Design a protein with these regions (language model features):
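Short aromatic-glycine-(Arg/Gly/Cys) micro-motifs in beta-strand/loop hairpins
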Residues: 1-17, 44-48
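Solvent-exposed serine/threonine-rich low-complexity stretches and specific carbohydrate-binding patches
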Residues: 17-19, 59
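Short, mixed-charge low-complexity intrinsically disordered segments
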Residues: 33-61
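Conserved aromatic
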Residues: 20-25
Length: 61
C-alpha cells in the first residue's frame, strides 16, 4: 500500500500537493508534524491504490 498526506482543506486528493510516505507509520509522523507546523490543522492520510485514493485517517497535533 502507498500512503500520502495533505491538509484536509485541500478537499480532494492532490497527487502533486501531497507529501508521499513510505508506509502508514511514516504517514502518521508526517501528518502529525505538518499539523503541528500549521497550528493544529487537520491532515488527511490517504491510502493510494492503482485506481483511486481513499481517505484513510485524520490526524491533528
Amino acid at each position: 500500500m502507498t500512503f500520502a498526506v495533505q491538509p484536509a482543506t485541500f478537499g480532494n486528493f492532490d497527487e502533486h500537493g501531497c507529501e508521499w510516505a513510505t508506509d502508514l507509520d511514516h504517514a502518521r509522523d508526517i501528518a502529525f508534524d505538518w499539523s503541528a507546523d500549521e497550528g493544529g490543522a487537520k491532515m488527511i492520510v490517504w491510502r493510494v491504490g492503482t485506481v483511486s485514493a481513499t481517505r484513510w485517517l485524520e490526524v491533528v497535533a
